[in-house]
């Protein structure tokens, strides 16, 4: 173990005597260097503060001149917090004496993590009341929010820490402050079921506001299934009759899909129906749908007590009612609307009803693409679920276990929607696509193409498939490391796209159809690797030969002056199957001489040849 690691471990474990021995013979400069070094993203002081070693913290500050503000990586409950200062770590872990010492040594009380979380927020999160009080007494700012606009009061409400919430309110915390998504502390109480704190907030004049999705605290409670909050707020003076009805109907939908309690759902739906008809002079009818939805099996919402009673005998119809109600009240842009449509589809798939599953998932995907930003993780999750489902169906069909088949139209429809997602992302020039999400979407498309190659099709369908792939390639999308679709097709890492296996990569079939549809075989990634280089790294001679036959330049070099041949594993058979002499021309040899001898050629040879020579640099 090296000295740096030994020093780090001693600080983390609170072994002060060991640390003093390790540093005894070191100069001031050496000590300063060792104490400022990070191991796994954290300094010795940060670890000592995290684990509450007061004597170690004071030794590092007073004897070693450790920097009191330098942040780093700390782990809490399996989550890594980046850029956490020592005071934040001590506050989060509940070490009051360490917090006091750090502040006495001049630590900034409002220094934040990378996500803008303050030490006060950290203490509020885990309910450390004494630390909260101490920090506030030392001028901690109550209103500094994290990057989501979530305040200390909000997190105290969400975590159910009533005493902390009360203390913050007494100290003047803004009870009606809104987060980036527009939710308030009342929403946090509703989502966590903290009824006592909610009552306290209302005493401090909290207002029933809507968040960015149009959700009131009452609807938030209905979505999360907190009946205590729903019962309280439906009797509150600020709640209108229509709001009460919607809340009860939505709560019933939550009972169907989240709690799987159909009788409980009926109870709340009956309550809501009685409210609709309670005033015979002003009956509140449900809106008449403009069209019936095929994905919901053309179901329509019940509109009378008699129709509601009829649902008891038809659990499947009840489940469709839940989806209809949720879509009507929350709207298509709320994440829960599409989430539960997908959930219901997955339940159908588990029971072997793949057609119903596909119809529901397609409907949810359309909803997501119409309402979410391009390459939203939720949309990517939907596309991946389709790929996994189709893969499963094709495998089982091959075993003769299923009567259901994957149709070309089903697969092709999802491929088209996947390509549309890439188009949407690339057109959005003001906000560049997240490289990781783009890479995932590209990988999913390649898996769908791979699956399509296993499904029989007519000549007309084959033409449409290739036309779509051509359109996809013409977008020139790039994933991580600036990988093109062809790079991804020849890389084994493309196999790992989700939890369940879909297709195996490198894929000769996918590579072949990409080349046929116009993929550039000499395209480069961020390290100047061509697809041939990546195929060589993956030791796939068949793909390498296909790329070479299709015009890939065999002795083109990457950023590290390596050819594809240099990257082949000496132990693998591919090294013997690919013979450089068979693919090297006199033109290549001449280009190498120009590059190796640094002969100036630009402007002296045709542009086409300049490009050719540059391949050998």
Swiss-Prot record:
Gene Ontology, cellular component aspect: Cul2-RING ubiquitin ligase complex; cytosol; nucleoplasm; ubiquitin ligase complex
InterPro entries: Ankyrin_rpt, Ankyrin_rpt-contain_sf, TPR-like_helical_dom_sf
Pfam families: Ank (PF00023), Ank_2 (PF12796)
Pathway: Protein modification; protein ubiquitination
Modified residues (N-acetylmethionine): 1
Keywords of this entry: Acetylation, ANK repeat, Repeat, TPR repeat, Ubl conjugation pathway
First and last residues of every TPR repeat: 245-279, 338-371
GO molecular function: ubiquitin-like ligase-substrate adaptor activity
UniProt ANK repeat ranges: 2-31, 40-70, 82-111, 115-144, 148-177, 181-210, 213-242, 481-523, 527-556
Function: Substrate-recognition component of a Cul2-RING (CRL2) E3 ubiquitin-protein ligase complex of the DesCEND (destruction via C-end degrons) pathway, which recognizes a C-degron located at the extreme C terminus of target proteins, leading to their ubiquitination and degradation. The C-degron recognized by the DesCEND pathway is usually a motif of less than ten residues and can be present in full-length proteins, truncated proteins or proteolytically cleaved forms.
Entry note about domains: The first seven ANK repeats at the N-terminus (1-242) are essnetial for recognition of Lys/Arg-Xaa-Arg and -Lys/Arg-Xaa-Xaa-Arg C-degrons.
Similarity comment: family membership: Belongs to the fem-1 family.
Quaternary structure annotation from Swiss-Prot or TrEMBL: Component of a CRL2 E3 ubiquitin-protein ligase complex, also named ECS (Elongin BC-CUL2/5-SOCS-box protein) complex, composed of CUL2, Elongin BC (ELOB and ELOC), RBX1 and substrate-specific adapter FEM1C.
Protein name: Protein fem-1 homolog C
Organism listed in the record: Bos taurus
Top-level taxonomy: Eukaryota, Metazoa, Chordata, Craniata, Vertebrata
